Amino acid sequence: MKRILLVNPNTNAATTASMLAIAREAAAGLLQIEAMTAPEGVPMITDPLALQQASQVLTGLIPELRAQNWDGVITAAYGDPALQALREGLDCPVTGIGEASMLEAAGYGAFAVVTTTPELAGSITAMAGWLGLGALFGGVYLTRGDAVAVTDDPALLVERLEEACLRAVHEAGGGLASLIIGGGPLAVAARVLVERVPVRLIEPVPASIRRIGLMVQRANG
């Protein structure tokens, strides 16, 4: 069985555990999924500086990851920190939850991202452009309130994300085929919202498992 490492670029071990459980469910026993929490950094990436710092931390882990001989690696924060560095430094396929979810969403048509971190909206928009998906990208919709405070309250997080999802659907006037819940710490809330949102909801962690599975399969010909 192929061994996949999901790396949480922030320092919150509870977030890592939640994402690992969701990833293993998505893998359905076809991949062996393990997880690692960043050894330093911030508990939640909320701005470009924290995203850059997370990239530096993950880049520093490349020698360790190379020695562990993973079959695939996932960078599991929505800004995909260190994605290119990991691809260049490792001898295995690498994806990120941002890239994987956007590419999956684009397969259905126009999409938007719903998230809690206003300071990362520019990075998310840039990612859509870098992936060549600008024509399908419907923008970033934000939850009300402080990102950390909202994320730390599971019930409030679901409520605010649902509100933002419904606002996105309304403002798009039926023009969106899907919405992405953008953020590793939002993974559990995304599971809840699948049944509540009137368009297809893309969960980044399961999307990354599907993508890395295909990448590993292709790499092994």
Regions found by a protein language model. Give the residues of each.
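Short, hydrophobic alpha-helical segments
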Residues: 169, 212-220
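N-terminal beta-loop-helix "entrance" segment that forms/cooperates
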Residues: 35-59, 148-153
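N-terminal beta1-alpha1 ligand-phosphate binding loop
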Residues: 3-26
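Periplasmic-binding protein-like
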Residues: 6-7, 67-77, 173-184
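Glycine-rich, highly charged phosphate/nucleotide-binding loops
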Residues: 47-68, 156-165
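Short, acidic/small-residue loops that bind anionic groups at enzyme active sites
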Residues: 87-107, 193-212
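Short hydrophobic segments within beta-strands
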Residues: 7-9, 36, 114, 182
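Active-site rim beta-loop-alpha module in soluble metabolic enzymes
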Residues: 117-173, 177-183
